[in-house]
């Protein structure tokens, strides 16, 4: 069950790793959260190409910001980045009940829901990550992709037995071949 989304808003200058991590930390402290925090996402985020000028990657920034106190952040990543087409197909299968899973998303997760509805698919099966320009700031950004990517990585990590089963083609999957419709993902 996806309960809530916490977004870094550009107008509040929260759309960067340190600011969003602080926002999450403050929210969790306000709610007296003591159960620990798992930090997951794209395993490529550990690579040198994603570090800041000091050589620190986003996962280190997040765990250091959340601190060593009651939040006890732990990085939980897949060993390597799953192929985008395969992971998107897996997520669609999970939505269809693959391996007995039932995925529900709270109505308050408006941006995630928007991404899942409007994210387009390229002809090769990958996500269309077209950039748009913000009318107010003039800054280019990826309109759809980040939140659906987060969901992909989360499901591939936490449902890893089902993910492995799906990749191997195990299970009682029925494959239906039809004409390709490239209007959007099936999420």
Identify the function of each model-found stretch.
Residues 137-167:
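Acidic, Mg2+-coordinating catalytic module of metal-dependent nucleases/exonucleases
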């Amino acid at each position: 069950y996806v309960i809530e989304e916490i977004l870094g808003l550009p107008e509040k200058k929260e759309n960067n790793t340190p600011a969003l991590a602080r926002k999450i930390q403050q929210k969790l402290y306000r709610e007296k959260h003591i159960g620990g925090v798992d930090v997951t996402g794209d395993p490529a985020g550990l690579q040198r190409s994603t570090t800041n000028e000091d050589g620190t990657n986003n996962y280190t920034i997040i765990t250091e910001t959340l601190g060593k106190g009651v939040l006890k952040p732990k990085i939980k990543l897949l060993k390597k980045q799953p192929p985008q087409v395969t992971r998107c197909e897996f997520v669609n299968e999970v939505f269809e009940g693959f391996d007995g899973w039932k995925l529900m998303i709270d109505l308050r997760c408006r941006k995630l829901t928007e991404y899942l509805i409007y994210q387009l698919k390229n002809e090769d099966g990958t996500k269309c990550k077209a950039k748009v320009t913000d009318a107010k700031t003039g800054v280019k950004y990826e309109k759809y992709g980040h939140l659906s990517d987060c969901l992909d990585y989360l499901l591939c990590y936490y449902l890893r037995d089902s993910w492995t089963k799906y990749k191997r083609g195990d299970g009682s999957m029925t494959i239906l071949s039809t004409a390709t419709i490239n209007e959007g993902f099936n999420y």
